[in-house]
Swiss-Prot record:
It holds the Pfam family NACHT. In an autoinhibited form the C-terminal leucine-rich repeat (LRR) domain is positioned to sterically occlude one side of the NBD domain and consequently sequester NLRC4 in a monomeric state. An ADP-mediated interaction between the NBD and the WHD also contributes to the autoinhibition. The gene is NLRC4. GO terms for molecular function: ATP binding. ATP binds at residues 169-176. GO terms for cellular component: cytosol; IPAF inflammasome complex. Residues 95-298 are annotated as: Nucleotide-binding domain (NBD). This is NLR family CARD domain-containing protein 4. It is found in: Cytoplasm, Cytosol. Signal peptide: none annotated. Phosphorylated at Ser-533 following infection of macrophages with S.typhimurium (Salmonella). Phosphorylation is essential for NLRC4 inflammasome function to promote caspase-1 activation and pyroptosis. PRKCD phosphorylates Ser-533 in vitro. Residues 1-88 form the CARD domain.
Length: 1017
């Protein structure tokens, strides 16, 4: 009995099912075991469990039963019997044998045959070295709910290793390389956590055949013939946790080929050896329940991707590629997958010069690699079945893009061979902690590429039904906003896949004129447009500004399609049709290479643009070669911008140039600007915060033979500059902002009358006195073509506004917009305006806000309101205030009943009470203004009850973009907050809401918050 007890572990591991059954038959004949006991043992699924059952039963039956058991064992497995008695004919493994075996493994793990590997498969002769190309992975420890618990380093994983350890990750995440790295670290002795292991075995499960002993012999070791399988396996058993198995690729493992390795993972508690096994996400479900530690391979870090690129590419290629990645958000995201980094590097190898490959090229390479690399997994499948499955995968991706779905259900794959898509790596299957599995493409961008590839094949198919299907998808793209957001990448990859598909796409895009929803377009996030409150956008309606941003995005989308397209010269006409009438924004600090190609390859397309906007920035001076330099021997204007515009053989219709934050301007800068300015028929120049340009503006203007618009903002001017401005007689637009210097005789206001062609004049926050205002009024009488006048934030001009208003309105004119905001407007000036309103019949925008009328203000305002019916084209009305002005509200609303086209209304500081606000609410209820966008009711005296009553009419303003209900010390009732929240949820175009002075707590704010800007302080 003691002998059997002492050797029970070896017996359990090595008897085998055949021997067990033979022994059971004899013990049954000898009446040691009964029928039921034999059936129980034979019914065990695993041979080790059967062996364990036999031994436990025999030990319970006493010494005679034990002797009969050993007698039968000697008969049926003589080598094992002899070995247990120390009489084995085979060599027993000594410590020296183990040391030799370990040394042999270490030699192998440090040899070129192990360290050098083919990252793209052996069919592609591109080789990496594990020592030089390995980068530290990001690992995530998972909890029992399959949630990420904490981040681990490789050393952290090894320090806290539990067995079995399962490492999961999608294809291309570097799982195999990780296990190879562990083997290499063990061999080098550099990792303290691995020194406890006597033996480390790295096995590729895709090549596992036979038993564990046979697989080790086949992949790693030449085990001496004198060491039997039983001896070797028994030794591994005794070493327990001093043996580490690195099992790579459970997703490619055929368990029936090697049940011992399957048991090593799933019955690890019996083997006691340490195991790390890798698998893809979709195969995790087969072994997840057996894992003591589960870790996910996370995204590759930016620094790791950079290190890998610099290691495998020539220095100049690496620099060019890193620059390309830096410029592309899509590429930066894709670089989080190691295999994609490898592909991006691989397609540059063997080239004599760097080629900036398109995203489509990279994805196409990746797609084809997946299909070809895994073709051995599709043996036995008909090519037609594979093609059908791939087409369905493309349709799935395409439908997902249109429905914004990036997760798919089993029903979505009901008509396809799921295994084809999973084994090729096109789809990943997620089952952990899910009642139903979820399917995803490995990356959202890859789904969009697969969709674009499929759409391209549909549009160019020889089958009419498929072409119709493809065109049907194009017809779903009916608005610019959807094309530039939802479908931009889909179109990018469609055009990158086929020139003929590009032709079809461009023809469709050229016919798209609907803007679609402008919700989500932010004027504050685009460099093309001034960053200011929605309330201050008085030059045009908010919708028009958003539409301009939308068109600019549409142009950028078209240029991206040009850059991605396979053939551009053959598509010149289609591109020209698309770009005609559109605008383009260029940042001179970051001019992409493809713009040079665009100008050179499709010059007619660039000249077809309505206007091009170009921004220049001051700061550290750069030398002519482009390097920054603090000495003023260099320039601010990049020579790259000069090359782009001056070398171009055609002309833009309009060039809009902005100079920002220039502290100086050299002669070279001015010469560069002249070259750039010459590339357009018409020039718009905007100078913003250029403190150092005082005295230089005249030199700049002298180079502008074609300037039609000049805006100067927060940039000081000398007398010479002002005089030169008024000498540019072809100016059509002039704007001066934030100029707080004393006006000198003979300057701007004295000579404005020289600008006979001026159509738009804007003077904002400039220092003027009454005498300057008088001279300005005299000059205005000569400006017969004026259609827009904005005078804002002018103080200390005394009665100067009386002269200006009289000059403006004395004779019939073409003025369409007048803004006299915060500019000392008097009651007398308003009376004059009212009396002469018939001379301003074409006026559509009248803004007199931020003015307090003192003497005769009430009477003047009533006169103006009484004559508003003259302005049949009125869209914007912003009124001043005075004492007891609210009594004029009823008459104002009577007049506004005739103005259904009203877009903006301002009654700031009218001191409206609950009674008046109810009247205004009834007006909005009875007169739905379809295009109404902005409402300013700040500074009124309305209670919660008044605002609540106002809501029923207010909610009819469906197109509202901005409103201001600011007041002093209003503590809103809960019912008002709830009602306002309900109304806000209906106003889907809202961009900004101002409730300054409303005493709102955190609960109120959380209820009111939406997709708009909420200003409460």
């Amino acid at each position: 009995m003691n002998f059997i007890k002492e050797n029970s572990q070896v017996l359990i591991q090595r008897m085998g099912m055949t021997v067990i059954k033979q022994i059971l038959d004899e013990l049954f004949v000898w009446n040691v075991m009964n029928y039921e006991e034999v059936n129980v043992i034979c019914g065990e699924k695993f041979e080790q469990d059967a062996a364990r059952g036999v031994i436990h039963m025999i030990l319970k039956k006493g010494s005679e039963a034990c002797n009969l058991f050993l007698k039968s064992l000697e008969k049926w497995n003589y080598p094992l019997f002899q070995e247990l008695h120390g009489l084995s004919l085979f060599h027993q493994m000594s410590e020296e044998d183990l040391d030799d075996l370990a040394q042999e493994l270490k030699y192998f793990y440090q040899s070129p045959s192990f360290l050098n590997f083919y990252p793209l498969g052996e069919d592609i002769d591109i080789m990496f070295n594990l020592k030089s190309t390995f980068t530290e992975p990001v690992l995530w420890k998972k909890d029992q709910h399959h949630h990420r618990l904490e981040q681990l380093t490789l050393s952290g994983l090894l320090d806290t290793l539990q067995s079995p350890c399962i490492i999961e990750g999608e294809s291309g995440k570097g799982k195999s390389t990780l296990l190879q790295r562990i083997a290499m670290l063990w061999a080098s002795g550099e990792c303290q956590a691995l020194t406890k292991f006597k033996l480390v075995f790295f096995l590729r499960l895709s090549r596992a055949q036979g038993g564990l002993f046979e697989t080790l012999s086949d992949q790693l070791l030449d085990i001496p013939d004198v060491i039997s399988k039983q001896t070797f396996m028994a030794r591994l058993l005794k070493l327990r946790q001093r043996v580490l198995f690195l099992l790579d690729g459970y997703n490619e493992f055929k368990a029936q080929n090697c049940p011992e390795i399957e048991a090593l993972i799933k019955e690890n508690h019996r083997f006691k050896n340490m195991v790390i096994v890798t698998t893809t996400t979709e195969s995790l479900r087969h072994i997840r329940q057996f894992g003591a530690l589960i870790a996910e391979v996370g995204d590759m870090t930016e620094s790791s991707a950079q290190a890998l690129i610099q290691e495998v590419l020539r220095k100049e290629f690496a620099e060019d590629l890193l620059l390309q990645i830096q410029k592309s958000r899509c590429l930066r995201n894709l670089m989080k997958t190691p295999l994609f980094v490898v592909i991006t590097c691989a397609i540059q190898m063997g080239k004599s010069e760097f080629h900036s490959h398109t995203q489509t090229t990279l994805f196409c390479t990746f797609y084809d690699l997946l299909i070809n690399k895994n073709r051995h997994k599709r043996k036995g499948l008909a090519p037609s079945e594979v093609t059908q499955s791939l087409d369905h995968c493309g349709d799935l991706a395409l439908e997902g893009v249109f429905s914004r779905r990036f997760d798919f259900e089993p029903d979505d794959l009901s008509n396809v061979n799921e295994d084809v898509l999973l084994t090729t790596g096109l789809l990943c299957k997620y089952t952990a902690q899910r009642f139903k599995p979820k399917y995803k493409f490995f990356h959202q961008s890859f789904q969009e590429y697969t969709a674009g590839r499929r759409l391209s094949s549909l549009l160019t198919s020889g089958e009419p039904a498929e072409v119709t299907k493809g065109n049907g998808h194009l017809q779903k793209m009916v608005s610019i906003s959807d094309i530039t957001s939802k479908y931009s990448n889909l179109l990018l990859y469609t055009c990158g896949s086929s020139a003929e598909a590009t032709r079809t796409v461009l023809k469709h895009l050229s016919s798209v004129y609907q803007h679609g929803s402008l919700l989500g377009l932010s004027v504050t996030k685009r460099p093309l447009w001034r960053q200011e409150s929605m309330q201050n956008m008085k030059s045009t309606t908010v919708q028009e500004i958003l539409k301009a941003i939308n068109i600019n995005s549409f142009t950028e989308c078209g240029i991206n399609l040009f850059h991605e397209s396979i053939s551009t010269s053959s598509l010149s006409k289609e591109f020209e049709d698309f770009f005609r009438g559109k605008s383009l924004y260029i940042n001179s600090e970051n001019i992409p290479d493809y713009l040079f190609d665009f100008f050179e390859d499709l010059p007619n397309c660039a000249s077809a643009l309505d206007f091009v906007k170009l921004d220049f920035y001051g700061g550290a001076v750069r030398d002519i070669s482009g390097n920054q330099d603090q000495e003023f021997s260099g320039t601010y204007i990049p020579s790259r911008a000069v090359s782009l515009f001056f070398n171009w053989k055609q002309e833009f219709k309009t060039l809009d140039v902005t100079l920002r934050d220039f502290c100086k301007l050299s002669k070279k800068d001015i010469k560069y600007l002249e070259k750039i300015f010459s590339s357009a028929t018409s020039l718009r120049l905007h100078i913003k915060r250029c403190v150092g340009m005082a005295g230089s503006l005249s030199s700049v203007l002298s180079t502008c033979k074609n300037i039609h618009s000049l805006i100067v903002e927060a940039s000081p001017l000398t007398l010479e500059d002002e005089q030169h401005i008024t000498s540019v007689t072809n100016l059509q637009t002039l704007g001066v902002h934030d100029l707080q210097i004393q006006r000198l005789p003979g300057g701007l206001t004295d000579n404005l009358g020289n600008l006979k062609n001026l159509m738009k004049l804007i003077l904002d926050n400039i220092q003027m006195n009454e005498e300057d205002a008088l001279k300005l009024a005299e000059g205005l009488t000569n400006l017969k073509k004026m259609c827009l006048l904005r005078l804002t934030h002018l103080s200390d001009i005394g009665e100067g506004m009386d002269y200006i208003v009289k000059s403006l309105s004395a004779e019939p004119c073409d003025l369409k917009e007048i803004q006299l905001v915060s500019c000392c407007l008097s009651g007398n000036a308003v009376k004059t305006l009212a009396q002469n309103l018939h001379n301003l019949a074409r006026l559509s925008i009248l803004d007199l806000s931020e003015n307090h009328l003192e003497k005769d203000g009430k009477e003047a305002l009533q006169q103006l309101i009484d004559r508003l019916h003259i302005l049949e084209q009125l869209t914007v009305l912003m009124l001043p205030w005075c004492g007891d002005v609210r009594v004029s509200l009823a008459r104002l609303l009577e007049q506004l009943e005739r103005v259904p086209q009203l877009v903006k209304l301002g009654l700031k500081n009218w001191r409206l009470t609950d009674a008046e606000i109810r009247i205004l609410g009834v007006f909005f209820e009875k007169n739905p203004l379809e295009n109404f966008q902005q409402l300013d009711l700040a500074g009124n005296c309305v209670s919660s009850d008044g605002w609540l009553a106002f809501m029923s009419g207010f909610e009819n303003l469906k197109e509202l973009v901005f409103f201001d209900f600011s007041t002093k010390g209003l503590l809103p009732d809960a019912s008002l907050v709830r009602k306002l929240s309900h109304v806000l949820s209906k106003l889907t175009f809202l961009q900004e809401v101002q409730l300054v002075g409303w005493q709102l707590d955190d609960d109120d704010v959380s209820v009111l918050k939406g997709a708009f800007k909420l200003v409460i302080a």
